[in-house]
Amino acid sequence: MIKEPFLKRFVLSTKKLVTKIPRYFSKFSNKIYDNHQKLSILILRQRLKMTYREIINFLKFNPLARAMLNLKKVPEFTTLIKFHNRLKPEELNSLLCDKQANIIAVDASGFQTNHMSYHYANQWHSQDKRKYRRYLKLTIAIDTNTQYVMAQKIRLSPRHDTIDFPFVLRDLKCDYVVADRGYDSKKNRRFVLRQMKSFPEIPYRSISPTYRFSGGNKLEFHKQIYHQRSKVETVFSVIKRKYGNYILSQTFESQKKELIFRLIAYNVDRKLILSLVLIRVSSEPFNISFKYLNF
C-alpha cells in the first residue's frame, strides 16, 4: 500500500496535472463532482491497482484522501464507470508529458486482457490449433533522460511494430530516435529524417541495405546513442511490475483508456521519484577537500 507522505504528493501532483481538462464538460452538469476530482480518482485507482469498488472503499475509510480531493461525499462506483466511458482517448493523451526531448526511444509490449496467465490461457484453448494470442499491444515513445511516456498507440491483437512507429512520433520533437531492429525500414528512417528533422538510430537487419542520402553518403549509426534504447524496456518493466500486466476492462475502448490512465499514473509516479532525488542531492552538504591544493 502507498505510504501517507507519498500519497499526499501523488494526489497533489495529480490535481495539478488534470487542470488541463475542463472542470465541467457542460454548463448543465449537476456540479456534485467535477472532472478534476473524478480524473484524480481514476489515476489514483491505477496507482493502487484497485477495482472501481475497491477505490471507493479506500476513499470511504481514508479521510486524508477525501480531504485532498475536496470530496464532500464519496461517489458511487457507477459514477466513475460512467465518467470513464464518456472520456475520449484524445482527452487523456493531453495529460501525457511534454512533446520535446533530446533522445526518444520507441518500443512495444503486450498486456493481457484478462487475469489468466499465458500458459493457462493456452491450456484453456488447447483444442484450438493456434495459440491464445488475444492481448493489447502498446507502443510508447519515451524521453530517455526522464523516462517519461510522451506518446502512445494501442492496438488489439498482434501487429507488426512498424505500423505504429510514425503515429507515436508525429507530434514529437527530438534530436535522435532510437528503436530496435523491429523498426528497421527505409520508410521509418525517411520519416524521422524528413518529417521530424532528426536522426534515426535503428540497427540494420542482415537483409537490409544501408540507407543513403541523395548525395550517396551513408547514414551513420551511433552505438553509444542507441544504447539509450534499453530505458524504454525499463519503463515497460516498471509499469507491469507496479501497476500490473493485465487490463480489467471488457471492451476495447475501455481497455485503451484504462491503459492510458496507467501511463499517466506512471508519469506522475516518475515525476515524484525524480523530485525526491533532486531534493536529496541538493540537501547534501557541499564539502571541498583541500588535500591536493598547494598554497
Language-model-detected regions and their locations in the chain:
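Basic, short loop/linker segments at the boundary and entry of helix-turn-helix/winged-helix-like folds
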Residues: I2-R47
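Arg/Lys-rich, glycine/proline-spaced intrinsically disordered segments
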Residues: F28-S29, R205-G215, L272, S282-S283, ...
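Polybasic low-complexity intrinsically disordered regions
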Residues: N30-K31, H36, L44-R53, N57, ...
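Non-catalytic DNA-binding core/recognition domains of DNA-processing enzymes
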Residues: Q37, L59-F61, E76
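DNA-recognition alpha helix
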Residues: R53-L69
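Major-groove recognition helix of helix-turn-helix-like DNA-binding domains
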Residues: A67-L87
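Helix-centered, glycine/charged polyanion-binding patches within enzymatic domains
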Residues: R181-L248
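Basic, amphipathic alpha-helical segments enriched in Lys/Arg and hydrophobic/aromatic residues
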Residues: H222-F295
